[in-house]
């Protein structure tokens, strides 16, 4: 059974479009909705429970098939601030650049998600940013 989405695609898409249009000026609620939407999308694309992706304080998702944890801190964790995560999800920042810049904390052998990113199509002039197909 696929994970339950916390954000409707319409609301998430609108929030992501607003963030892409003005990352520094978007309000906290809109940023949070965009984060939850992209985390939901990651969970839908890579179902599983072997990696936990955390974007405090807005949300977390477990994803990627493999051994799952049941108690305590999971062995495979990815953590980023909201803007770093959204830039990764949007294709505006590469995994390697985020790691090299210290903007991404990764632990565990399964926690490298670069093959799953970006989650949205790059923007083109006048087009919606949040078409969630690859």
Task: Name each region found by the language model.
Residues 1-134:
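Feature captures hydrophobic
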């Amino acid at each position: 059974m696929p994970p339950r989405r916390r954000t409707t695609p319409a609301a998430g898409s609108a929030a992501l479009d607003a963030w892409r249009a003005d990352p520094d000026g978007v309000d906290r609620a809109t940023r949070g909705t965009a984060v939850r939407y992209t985390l939901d999308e990651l969970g839908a694309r890579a179902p599983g429970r072997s990696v936990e992706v955390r974007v405090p304080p807005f949300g977390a998702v477990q994803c990627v098939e493999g051994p799952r944890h049941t108690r305590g801190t999971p062995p495979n964790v990815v953590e980023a601030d909201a803007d770093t995560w959204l830039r990764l999800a949007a294709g505006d920042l590469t995994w390697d650049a985020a790691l090299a810049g210290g903007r991404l904390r990764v632990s565990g052998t399964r926690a490298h998600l670069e093959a799953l990113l970006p989650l949205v199509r790059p923007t083109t002039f006048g087009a919606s940013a949040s078409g969630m197909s690859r």
